[in-house]
């Protein structure tokens, strides 16, 4: 069987958004390369490759893929070169070659993302493993925004909480939360493919038993308050999400936001303030920002 490989030349800032575009176009596998794993790429340059089966006529989809990649600039994302190229590859070429680029990655002192096919063992008795299958697309769980999200979870969780994961994608944040002692986790994503990918990853991690994963558009129609709501999404999605949060956030609870590029931080802060939320702490990694927020009180 032959596959069609579509590669988008871009920068790190846009890799997850482009991966989602390619997945929605019908890709069955995603490969992300940057300077840390490919020495032909320099600085912030990255490449996102997607693999389409023979049943998908890719040339017909290319114009829309190119259009959607270019539209990312309207959301404040830099896409770098933004070129889109395709080539034919044999089944064996992509089915194994991409795995060498995906290695165990320490997200925090105690949480490590591990490819599902490795026999990696914890180096510390306190180290917990998040096993992931990036063949499901929706990222490998190693993007800076994921690092920020998991760091924020470690900062606010004490165990026993109720948590809502909005835009769960690969499910990595729900898995991390389960490792950190959260008792009740609800994971939502507007895309059924993402929900299926998350459930597949949950199955790789016994600690996630009991997580509820369903398709849903942000928090529309959701009932039942939570101690923590976490969302790692682009600002264009976070802005309409924020007004939905106060009704579902328990007193003393936290809203954790990631996926925010530095230039959009002010817009997010303004939206938070307008909806009765305030920033308690901010974290930074490169051009990305993570915000730990809570409901305002009479004392604020």
Swiss-Prot record:
It is found in: Cytoplasm. Keywords: Cytoplasm, Methyltransferase, S-adenosyl-L-methionine, Transferase. Pfam families: PrmA. GO terms for molecular function: protein-lysine N-methyltransferase activity. The keyword Repeat does not apply. It catalyses: L-lysyl-[protein] + 3 S-adenosyl-L-methionine = N(6),N(6),N(6)-trimethyl-L-lysyl-[protein] + 3 S-adenosyl-L-homocysteine + 3 H(+). Belongs to the methyltransferase superfamily. PrmA family. InterPro entries: Ribosomal_L11_MeTrfase_PrmA, Ribosomal_PrmA_MeTrfase, SAM-dependent_MTases_sf. Its EC number is 2.1.1.-. GO terms for cellular component: cytoplasm. This is Ribosomal protein L11 methyltransferase. It comes from Latilactobacillus sakei subsp. sakei (strain 23K). Disulfide bonds: none annotated. S-adenosyl-L-methionine binds at residues 146, 167, 189, 232. The keyword Methyltransferase applies. The lineage of its organism: Bacteria, Bacillati, Bacillota, Bacilli, Lactobacillales. Methylates ribosomal protein L11. GO terms for biological process: methylation.
